C-alpha cells in the first residue's frame, strides 16, 4: 500500500468520525492539494510533493496533522 493511499484512508476516517459531509471535505482537500482522493488507489505511486500537499490540505481543511 502506498503512503498516499494510507493518507487517503486516514483523511476519510477523520471525515467520517467528525460527521462531516464527505463530498464537501474531499472536494476542498482535492482543490487545495491538486490530488483528488478518489483517484488515489493502493497502487498509486508515492510522490513526495503530492504527499506534502495532501498533508497540508488535510491540516488546513480538517485540522488534521498527518
Regions found by a protein language model. Give the residues of each.
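Generic structural marker for isolated residues within well-ordered, non-membrane alpha-helices
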Residues: 11, 22, 55
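Short alpha-helical "recognition helix" segments of helix-turn-helix
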Residues: 24-26
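A short, Lys/Arg-rich alpha-helix, primarily the initiator
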Residues: 1-18
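Recognition helix of helix-turn-helix/homeodomain-like DNA-binding domains
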Residues: 31-47
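DNA major-groove recognition helix of helix-turn-helix/homeodomain DNA-binding modules
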Residues: 48-66
Amino acid at each position: 500500500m502506498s503512503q498516499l493511499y494510507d493518507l487517503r484512508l486516514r483523511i476519510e476516517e477523520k471525515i467520517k468520525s467528525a460527521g462531516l459531509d464527505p463530498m464537501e471535505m474531499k472536494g476542498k482537500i482535492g482543490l487545495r492539494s491538486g490530488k483528488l482522493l478518489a483517484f488515489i488507489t493502493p497502487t498509486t505511486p508515492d510522490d513526495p510533493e503530492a504527499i506534502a500537499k495532501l498533508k497540508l490540505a488535510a491540516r488546513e481543511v480538517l485540522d488534521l496533522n498527518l
